[in-house]
Amino acid sequence: ETVHHVGFLVSKKGAIRGKHFHKEQKQYTLVQKGKIKVTIKNLEDKNSIVESKELNKMDMVLFPPYVYHSIEAVEDSECLIFTSKSRKGSGYEDDTFRVENINSFEL
């Protein structure tokens, strides 16, 4: 798989990032420092439930297309973000769909 963007995400304890999904791109997140809690839901599966998991240093997670994801910093954290689509210009916003309340959201 080709990586078209690498980002560096720095979050203070308690910060919640993401709360969105992508229709086209895959996103890999690698914890470099600290601890995070990822919350996901497969939006293409009507029977999918909201799931959460804590990740530590050097853990990696893949968010495929149509998987809602949020990242909460359990501790001050640093993550590398790798995506399969460029985020130059409007590349990020063009494929980012925000979700305020995942518990009531449907496609």
Residue ranges and their predicted role:
Residues 1-19:
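A short glycine-rich, His/Asp/Glu-containing loop-to-beta-strand
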Residues 12-14, 57-58, 64-66, 76:
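Tight coil/turn sites that cap or link beta-strands
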Residues 19, 38-39, 63, 69-74, ...:
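Short beta-strand His + acidic residue motifs that chelate non-heme Fe in jelly-roll/DSBH
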Residues 20, 26-31, 53, 61, ...:
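His/acidic/aromatic-lined binding-pocket segments of jelly-roll/cupin-type domains
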Residues 24, 59, 67, 75, ...:
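A generic "binding-loop/recognition-motif" signal
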Residues 24-43:
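Glycine- and acidic-residue-biased ligand/ion/polar-headgroup-sensing regions
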Residues 43-65:
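Short acidic-glycine-tyrosine-enriched beta hairpin
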Residues 74-107:
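Double-stranded beta-helix
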